Amino acid sequence: MLSPRRTKFRKQQRGRMRGLAHRGSTLNFGEYALQATEPSWITSRQIEAARRAMTRYIKRGGKIWIRVFPDKPVTMRAAETRMGSGKGSPEYWVAVVKPGRIMFELSGVAEPVAREAMRLAAQKLPIKTKFITRQEEYI
């Protein structure tokens, strides 16, 4: 699963997800893409599950680009721990995804195959997404 090799600080504040994604909102690599329409934290496990669903469907054809990276640590306290005594330890990593963010790109396959692969990937994600093509993007 994806995670940073090293970070400057072990723990981060939660932050807020306001507004639309301005960076990472255009098709850069492939012909087809999966675009987020809701804000959410996407875990590294969810990204990996979506990637596996797509690669299993398209088999050996096509190329997939993952456009989100989980660089935010999520901390958790041990179960049944009293309040106080500091912040919990980092448990997993998430990618902060805002509406408009392109999460996956795909090329080298026909549009019906790409559409179905993206649908399978979208089922693994906790947010609503939409399928876009390079032609639709500039309309």
UniProtKB/Swiss-Prot annotation:
SS bond list: none
Keyword DNA damage included in the entry's annotation: no
Keyword Phosphoprotein: no
GO molecular function per UniProt: rRNA binding; structural constituent of ribosome; tRNA binding
Alphabetized Pfam families for the sequence: Ribosomal_L16 (PF00252)
Domain of life: Bacteria
Record keywords: Ribonucleoprotein, Ribosomal protein, RNA-binding, rRNA-binding, tRNA-binding
GO CC annotation terms, alphabetical: cytosolic large ribosomal subunit
GO biological process: translation
Subunit and interaction comment: Part of the 50S ribosomal subunit.
Function: Binds 23S rRNA and is also seen to make contacts with the A and possibly P site tRNAs.
Family: Belongs to the universal ribosomal protein uL16 family.
Protein known as: Large ribosomal subunit protein uL16
Native organism: Crocosphaera subtropica (strain ATCC 51142 / BH68) (Cyanothece sp. (strain ATCC 51142))
